[in-house]
């Protein structure tokens, strides 16, 4: 079991229930899933780029990503309907907790010029979205073996009803928000 999951059950859940006055354990916000998305527009010109992106995403997430394809043709971007343009992974359960632990403890502190996560990135329903500019902040990625530095989107989906509950949940896991 991941340390953060144990921490959630033992300390975070009771604290949030007390803070927001929840009567049932099921009312307490919890993290439902973490979605990682990497847009690889260059894959249209070079098919090898997608292979490298899939390899990086597999190393970071610990599970095989799904290739996302273009839904419609856009002449300006030289893409056709059905072209592979990215990859994504949805983490749940044990892998989700392990990834969150690595993200908070290892990856976020390795971001260059880091001054805290923006609290404005909540969507109004307690879910948090963030962007990472370089995949090399994750320890699984070897700097010598990457072909190009590329970023990704990370969305943390919670069962919180509003942003206040979502922020309290993530702060309980030592998420470094700007003050």
UniProtKB/Swiss-Prot annotation:
Pfam families recorded: Ribosomal_L5, Ribosomal_L5_C
Gene Ontology CC, one term: ribonucleoprotein complex
NCBIfam families registered for this protein in UniProt: PRK00010.1 (NF000585)
InterPro entries per UniProt: Ribosomal_uL5, Ribosomal_uL5_bac-type, Ribosomal_uL5_C, Ribosomal_uL5_CS, Ribosomal_uL5_dom_sf, Ribosomal_uL5_N
Name listed for the protein in its UniProt record: Large ribosomal subunit protein uL5
Subunit composition and interactions: Part of the 50S ribosomal subunit; part of the 5S rRNA/L5/L18/L25 subcomplex. Contacts the 5S rRNA and the P site tRNA. Forms a bridge to the 30S subunit in the 70S ribosome.
Function recorded in the entry: This is one of the proteins that bind and probably mediate the attachment of the 5S RNA into the large ribosomal subunit, where it forms part of the central protuberance. In the 70S ribosome it contacts protein S13 of the 30S subunit (bridge B1b), connecting the 2 subunits; this bridge is implicated in subunit movement. Contacts the P site tRNA; the 5S rRNA and some of its associated proteins might help stabilize positioning of ribosome-bound tRNAs.
Family per record: Belongs to the universal ribosomal protein uL5 family.
BP term (GO), one: translation
Keyword tRNA-binding (UniProt): yes
GO molecular function: rRNA binding; structural constituent of ribosome; tRNA binding
UniProt keywords, alphabetically: Ribonucleoprotein, Ribosomal protein, RNA-binding, rRNA-binding, tRNA-binding
Highest taxon of the lineage: Bacteria
